[in-house]
Each structure stands twice: as C-alpha cells, then as structure tokens.
Amino acid sequence: MDGIRTSLDIEEYSDTEVQKNQVLTLEEWQDKWVNGNTAFHQEQGHRLLKKHLDTFLKGESGLRVFFPLCGKAVEMKWFADRGHSVVGVEISELGIREFFTEQNLSYSEEPVTEIPGTKIFKSSSGNISLYCCSIFDLPRTNIGKFDMIWDRGALVAINPGDRKCYADTMLSLLGKKFQYLLCVLSYDPTKHPGPPFYVPHAEIERLFGKICNIHCLEKVDAFEERHKSWGIDYLFEKLYLLTEK
C-alpha cells in the first residue's frame, strides 16, 4: 500500500495563523454569484447529510432548521418536504431567487423592518423563509430558536477573524436538545489561502467546546480534479455533530 494516501496518514495542522488575515468582502461573495463562480454549490445535495438525514430526524416532524449562508442549497427542500420549517440567510439575492426557481417553488418577498434594505423571501407553502442579509445582522430580526443547524459551506467561508462572532451568533440561535451539524475541510493551509478556509478540530473546540459536546461522525476524501488548481494534493471533509452539554 506504499504511496497510497489515507485519512489516517495525514495529521491536521493545529495552527490556523497562516490564514488568519484572509478576508473576503460581502461584495466579493455577491460577485461570485453574478459571475457564476459557485463551484461550492452541490446540485445533488450533500452526500453525508443524505446518508445520515433520517437518523438525525428520528421520524420527527415540525422541527425548525437553520441554514447559515444557505446559497441555493437543495437540502433546504429535503427538510421542507419532510414537514420541517426552514430558515436560511444568504447575502446574494440572486442565489435566493435561483433556489426558488430551480426547485419550482412559488414565493413572495417583503422588506424586513428591523434591518433597512433587507428582504425576506418566503415559499408559498410557508415552510421556507430566506433572509437576504449578512449573517451578523440576522439576530436583530428575533427569528427565535432552532432545533437543528445545517452548517455546510458556512463556517469554512467566514473570514477567520470573524469566527468567534459567527460561532456566538450560531450558539444564540440554538434551542434545547439541539443538533448542530457542521462540515469542515482539512487540507494544507500553507498551500491554499482559502476560501473555503481550513478549520481544524482544535478550532471547533475553541469556538463551541464550552457549550457543546463535539463528535466527529465521519471523515471522507473530498479531493477532486479541480482542487489541484488550489495547489493542494489532499482534501478531506469532516462531518461533526454538536449537541448540548
């Protein structure tokens, strides 16, 4: 087996300092949508969520599920179709409109009075509500608590210097007996500046460990041909389950 890379061979970089000053503005994220630079979107949905979804839901209905930095994630419809209420936040209005169009869902839009210039887009069925604003403005809307958070492509997209504020925002939205599903990426951060940014286990412990039990459920090889252009030669994705201590 010499020369074959496995997930057990590669140690994590515990140091996140190399990327700490990396910044992408909200305008740059919006430009990615305008220019179609959205390789982060997964048209078929996330394989690990698909694998574990029914286990997480345990046959329950009527849960409130939050999608930070939701884009046009197809998983939002998965939850809605199972009888759950979905709330998302996304800075790109284009991304939100594309979600409803591509999922063949009729919707309405209205201003959010608490945040000038912000809109909320609601499915006609009433169980999907997407806010078009910065994640850091969202607490001003008093959107309540959630039973579950699906964080794929959110924490890894947040500027490293904003992670503590982001984590505190997420924790403020969690209700009792919550399940926080978190996907992060592991690669050599000295070879790629991000985003998506590198988030090691130690960083998750730092951000969430005081409030949450942290369990790594699965680690899979996520390296694709396109990742060679990042200058890296391995990429692993890890799915964590965070629960109430």
From Swiss-Prot:
S-adenosyl-L-methionine binds at residues 29-40, 69, 90, 134-135, 152. Its EC number is 2.1.1.67. It catalyses: S-adenosyl-L-methionine + a thiopurine = S-adenosyl-L-homocysteine + a thiopurine S-methylether. The modification N6-acetyllysine is found at residue 58. The keyword Cytoplasm applies. It is found in: Cytoplasm. GO terms for biological process: methylation. GO terms for cellular component: cytoplasm. It holds the Pfam family TPMT. Keywords: Acetylation, Cytoplasm, Methyltransferase, Phosphoprotein, S-adenosyl-L-methionine, Transferase. It is an enzyme of class 2 (transferase). Belongs to the class I-like SAM-binding methyltransferase superfamily. TPMT family. Monomer. This is Thiopurine S-methyltransferase. It comes from Pongo pygmaeus. The lineage of its organism: Eukaryota, Metazoa, Chordata, Craniata, Vertebrata. The gene is TPMT.
